[in-house]
Design a protein with these regions (language model features):
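Basic, Lys/Arg- and aromatic-enriched nucleic-acid-binding interface segment
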Residues: 1-26, 30
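Short, basic (Lys/Arg/His-rich) helix/loop patches that form interaction surfaces
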Residues: 85, 100-152, 156-160
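Short, polar N-cap/turn motifs at the start of nucleic acid-interacting alpha helices
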Residues: 36-43, 130, 146-168, 191
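Conserved tyrosine-mediated DNA breakage-rejoining catalytic core shared by Y-recombinases
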Residues: 32-75
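Major-groove DNA-contacting interfaces characterized by cationic-aromatic clusters
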Residues: 64, 70-120, 204-206
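Feature representing long, continuous alpha-helical segments
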Residues: 20, 27, 31, 66, ...
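C-terminal secondary-structure termini that scaffold catalytic or DNA-interacting sites
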Residues: 110, 173-209
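Catalytic-site neighborhood detector that most strongly recognizes the C-terminal catalytic loop/helix
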Residues: 55, 155-184
Length: 209
């Protein structure tokens, strides 16, 4: 997250980190704009949208609401969701190709399994070589799970048990606190103009809980 990258990868880094923070499918991510940003009454910013994949299977058309951690808010304010790199997802110079270059530059080289259908063998390859936008959602869920956030809490996945129902109904404030803990991000509050408020405001709020 804090690694320095060359200028030609800075936009890719911002887009990749923001997509990781939002647990967002690439099709939905490409359509986000500042109109998707909202703020709770107690000052927690979040992104809300109707996921294209799940809206066809849910009768109540529930929006997905994901709180913005501080680093994600900074990217949103800096970019306004306008990423030229998202113009093309595939291709030699597309988003997925640049994600591979970004991960290679940052030395994300942990070995992972990759099945070779031609030879029916399992190969071990560096993670950066198979990086893509799909890795964003996996990264979000893996990190969130480390803070005991069930994967169903972070998106509108099919509900299959009472435990899943509990997690999928987490309030934005609770999910915000859990994600901040998982991603090692500070808790904060903002005003309606997306300005971060002094930390004393948060301290007083927590005292009054």
């Amino acid at each position: 997250m804090v690694a320095d990258v060359p200028d030609n990868l800075k936009e890719t880094k911002d887009a990749f980190l923001l997509q990781c923070a939002l647990d967002c499918r690439i099709g939905d991510f490409m359509k986000l704009s500042m109109s998707n940003v909202a703020v709770t009454d107690d000052g927690i910013p979040y992104v809300q949208y109707l996921p294209k994949k799940t809206m066809k299977t849910q009768n109540d058309r529930r929006e997905k609401k994901t709180p913005l951690m501080l680093f994600a808010l900074e990217i949103v304010k800096r970019s306004g969701f306008k990423f030229g790199v998202l113009r093309y997802a595939s291709g030699k110079s597309g988003y997925n190709a640049k994600i591979k270059k970004l991960l290679e530059h940052c030395k994300i080289d942990r070995l992972v399994n990759l099945y070779d259908e031609a030879t029916s063998t399992m190969n071990r390859v560096p993670l950066h070589s198979v990086g893509s936008s799909k890795l964003c959602r996996k990264t979000h869920i893996d990190i969130a799970n480390k803070a005991q956030v069930n994967m169903y809490a972070t998106g509108l996945h099919e509900v299959g048990s009472s435990a899943v129902e509990h997690y999928s109904m987490l309030e934005i404030r609770d999910l915000f606190m859990l994600l901040c803990a998982a991603f090692n991000q500070p808790r904060y509050r903002i005003d309606k103009q997306l300005n971060v408020l002094p930390s004393e405001n948060l301290a007083m709020e927590e005292i009054n809980l």
